[in-house]
């Protein structure tokens, strides 16, 4: 059996971040955690593009524009959606997730879902690093791992004996 696992050892990754201004106190914590984690892995944040959008619902469009630029190995999407008293939470959370997934699959690029979906502000604060873990840090780790894994699999795809390299398809 041949296993493929992404490794957390990329220091030259080109990463862009899309972040929601809504719930900015929380999203700034996520961004800070992401930037700290990027530096920890040796990825400079000095010229790192960070695109601020009004809310989580707008994240997929800007993530797609960044992905289509060809300038990035991965896009990290950060936001915080907190349940209120209306069904708005459900729509925004599900459509933001679906949009981010669609961008990743359409563009064939890691687009990481780093959007908190919580019932309370307290839960969001906890997950943004105020009391314990920071999901922004985890999003960076996911991006780095997925960059490495997709690189490994693209090398496999370009191998002379692969069905893709021979212009044949396993699925008919």
UniProtKB/Swiss-Prot annotation:
Pathway listed: Cofactor biosynthesis; riboflavin biosynthesis; riboflavin from 2-hydroxy-3-oxobutyl phosphate and 5-amino-6-(D-ribitylamino)uracil: step 1/2
Biological-process GO terms, alphabetical: riboflavin biosynthetic process
Pfam families named among the record's database cross-references: DMRL_synthase (PF00885)
GO cellular component: cytosol; riboflavin synthase complex
Annotated EC: 2.5.1.78
Catalytic residues of the enzyme: 88
Keyword field contains Transferase: yes
InterPro entries given in the database record: LS, LS/RS, LS/RS_sf
HAMAP family listed in its UniProt record: Lumazine_synth
Name of this protein: 6,7-dimethyl-8-ribityllumazine synthase
